[in-house]
Amino acid sequence: MPLSVSLPSKNYDYDYDSVQPYFYFEEEEENFYSAAQQRSSELQPPAPSEDIWKKFELLPAPPLSPSCRSNLAAASCFPSTADQLEMVTELLGGDMVNQSSICDPDDESFVKSIIIRDCMWSGFSAAAKLEKVVSEKLATYKASRREGGPAAASRPGPPPSGPPPPPAGPAASAGLYLHDLGAAAAGCIGSSVVFPCPLGRRGPPGAGPAALLGVDAPPTVGGGSEEEQEEDEEIDVVTLAEANESESSTESGTEASEEHCKPHHSPLVLERCHVNIHQHNYAAPPSTKVEYPAAKRLKLDSGRVLKQVSNNRKCSSPRTSDSEVNDKRRTHNVLERQRRNELKLSFFALRDQIPEVANNEKAPKVVILKRATEYVLSIQSDEHRLIAEKEQLRRRREQLKHKLEQLRNSRA
């Protein structure tokens, strides 16, 4: 979702044939990073590295709902949990966002937008700088709040475009950081929509602001006041859990939050969750759980059922398979025995036809085959010889017939 900020922006026409940038914007007319204006002559922007977190430093965050601001009747010198969250929002640049120019506040996509729920301030190099800037601005704000409280309360704010601003009185100390956001109060959304957690919970006794807010803060050394602990705390923006409630439950939650929204007894309990966005979250651990779609789960279940049925069939009929194997083996043995008997009888018949081994009942098969070969060759030679003798006798007969015919003709 694009943002409209007060920083000057220029139109860049990238030549995609020669320039292949690492970051692509949804609209080329908007450029969020002023550092890219100095690198317009270069062919390739720098590769994503440790400098990537400088581009995400101090991104503007949307203002909170005015429902909680109207009940900020903080008369004590120490701000409550809701005050601290609003101060962090303002110090991180909440006044730079024009809420009405982004989208409709009643739109569901605006409620579930990534900018509201995760500003990606949990980086490596930006965390230290963010902590330093927030601590300095927090100290400056507290000093100006103590000195110029009445002056800030008497300063008139700009007229709001929607509902009137919070009434003055006990909440005059909060006017210093609320008068700049009065114009954007009409575009705010309900606190129960953005923060689905109930506001009536209380932390354990003795828990610090970091424990109530659910932020990651290092343990501070004991012995200091609450101001020193708040200044030394490491502030980390956490991700809000997505609200999956219906519209009726949202309205009832909004009414309950307005009734129970008090400055000292309304800690916002935030929890970390993983948001699937296009930007890679380097700090999140790798997820090992694999979720399959419904169709794939049905296929896997059907495959398992088929495997179980086949296993049951195999287990239920072991005797049938064994009997079939035994029958096959028995048939094979009978056929093999018959083949061997026929082969033996054929050898015996061949042996009886050979005169050399006819009377030798113990003659081996190899000897029988050799003698049979020799006998066949001898028979073939005798055949050729007899054929030649027959041909000679036929010729002799023809000669004798011709000679007899001549003798008969001479006598006549």
UniProtKB/Swiss-Prot annotation:
Residues 309-320 have a biased composition (Polar residues). Residues 144-173, 208-264, 309-328 are annotated as: Disordered. GO terms for cellular component: host cell nucleus. Residues 386-407 are annotated as: Leucine-zipper. Residues 327-379 form the bHLH domain. It is found in: Host nucleus. One of its GO terms (molecular function) is DNA-binding transcription factor activity. Keywords: DNA-binding, Host nucleus, Oncogene. InterPro entries: bHLH_dom (IPR011598), HLH_DNA-bd_sf (IPR036638), Myc-LZ (IPR003327), Myc_transcription_factors (IPR050433), Tscrpt_reg_Myc (IPR002418), Tscrpt_reg_Myc_N (IPR012682). Residues 156-169 have a biased composition (Pro residues). The keyword DNA-binding applies. Residues 225-236 have a biased composition (Acidic residues). Residues 239-255 have a biased composition (Low complexity). Efficient DNA binding requires dimerization with another bHLH protein. Transforms avian and murine macrophages and fibroblasts as well as murine B-lymphoid cells. This protein is synthesized as a Gag-vMht-vMyc chimeric protein. The sequence shown here corresponds to the Myc homolog fragment of the chimera. This is Viral myc transforming protein. It comes from Avian retrovirus MH2.
